Structures are given as structure tokens and as C-alpha cells.
From Swiss-Prot:
GO cellular component, one term: cytosol
Ranges of compositional bias, category Low complexity: 8-21
Protein name: Protein GrpE
Function: Participates actively in the response to hyperosmotic and heat shock by preventing the aggregation of stress-denatured proteins, in association with DnaK and GrpE. It is the nucleotide exchange factor for DnaK and may function as a thermosensor. Unfolded proteins bind initially to DnaJ; upon interaction with the DnaJ-bound protein, DnaK hydrolyzes its bound ATP, resulting in the formation of a stable complex. GrpE releases ADP from DnaK; ATP binding to DnaK triggers the release of the substrate protein, thus completing the reaction cycle.
Start and end residues of each stretch annotated as Disordered: 1-21
Bilayer-spanning residue ranges: none
One GO molecular-function entry: protein homodimerization activity
BP GO annotations: protein folding
Cited Gene3D superfamilies: 3.90.20.20, Head domain of nucleotide exchange factor GrpE
Length: 181
């Protein structure tokens, strides 16, 4: 039996079944079919709305990730450059002691250029100056110093500068903190 014959037979069987049904029964049967199709349409609509919401959430997440990559993608580069900056600062401190003005001037210029370049990318130093209130979100306490010369819980000395990339902490300032006796 081919496809056309099967379809014709199915239609004939359905016609026989509906011919045997009263008009009220046919109405009930049609209402049931309509309700089933309406439920299927509602389910499909809900599925479409969920898929749209998923797509919108994906777009937002992708946009956020792209923005973070643009803002913080240089993090590893900056982390590699910071020790160079530290060594330049140490060289400046020791060169002043030896009185080598030309060397000091050259290192100062290099230091300034490096700081300017880092600022262009949103890198700035954390305030770890003497007298600044200790903040564990930005400072790492390396030592506590008992002293009455400084207010309690303030920075006495900065061992290594901390840095921020935009608003994100790259590394904390390493400091000693005052503790009143």
C-alpha cells in the first residue's frame, strides 16, 4: 500500500468515526483538539521567550567579558613591569647617597617615563605614605611597630609600593603599622 492509499484510508476511518459521533461529541472532540493545540502553542511561546532571554543574557555576558578583557587584559604585563619600577626606585634611593648626579638624573627620567606609561593604562600607586591609615584592602602589614610618635593603626613605613589597575588591586603595599604602647 502506498502513501496516498494510507492517507485516504486514515481519512476514511476518521470520517467513519466522526459519522458515528453525535454533533455534541464531535464538538467536545474538536474542543479537546483545540485545547491541545493551544497548550502546544503556549509551550512553544514560553520556549521562545526563554530562548530570547538566554540569548540576551549571553550578549550581556559577552559584552561584560569583552569590557573586562579590554580593561584588565594587560594585567600580566603590568605585573612583570612593576619589579622594574621597584628596582628603579631603589636605585634612585642609593644613587643619591653616592652623589652621582648624572646617573640619578637618568634613572629619574626613566622612572618618570615608566610611571607615565603605566598611568596611560590605568595603573596607579596605592597610598602607603607614612601616617596614612592602614587599610587591609590595599595594604599588607609586614610588621607592627610600637610607637607613640604615630597614631594607632597608621602606616609607619612603606617597604614596597602597591598598585591598582583601574580600580582593581594588582598588589598591596607592604608596610609596617603603628601600634601604641
Amino acid at each position: 500500500m502506498n502513501k496516498e492509499q494510507q492517507d485516504l484510508q486514515t481519512e476514511q476511518e476518521a470520517a467513519v468515526e466522526t459519522a458515528e459521533l453525535t454533533p455534541e461529541q464531535q464538538l467536545v472532540q474538536l474542543q479537546e483538539k483545540l485545547a491541545a493545540k493551544e497548550q502546544e502553542a503556549k509551550d512553544n511561546w514560553d520556549k521562545l521567550l526563554r530562548e530570547r532571554a538566554d540569548l540576551e543574557n549571553y550578549r550581556k555576558r559577552a559584552s561584560r567579558e569583552k569590557e573586562e578583557l579590554l580593561n584588565y587584559g594587560i594585567k600580566s604585563l603590568v605585573e612583570e613591569v612593576l619589579p622594574v619600577l621597584d628596582n628603579l626606585e631603589r636605585a634612585l634611593e642609593h644613587a643619591n647617597e653616592d652623589g652621582l648626579p648624572a646617573l640619578v638624573e637618568g634613572v629619574k627620567m626613566t622612572h618618570t617615563l615608566l610611571q607615565t606609561a603605566l598611568k596611560k593604562f590605568g595603573v596607579c600607586a596605592v597610598d602607603g605614605n607614612c601616617g596614612t591609615l592602614f587599610d587591609p584592602a590595599f595594604h599588607q602589614a609586614m610588621a607592627q611597630v610600637e610607637t607613640s610618635d604615630h597614631p594607632n593603626n597608621t602606616i609607619v613605613q612603606e617597604f614596597q609600593k602597591g598598585y591598582l589597575l583601574k580600580e582593581r588591586l594588582l598588589r598591596p603595599s607592604m608596610v609596617s603599622v603603628a601600634k601604641n604602647p
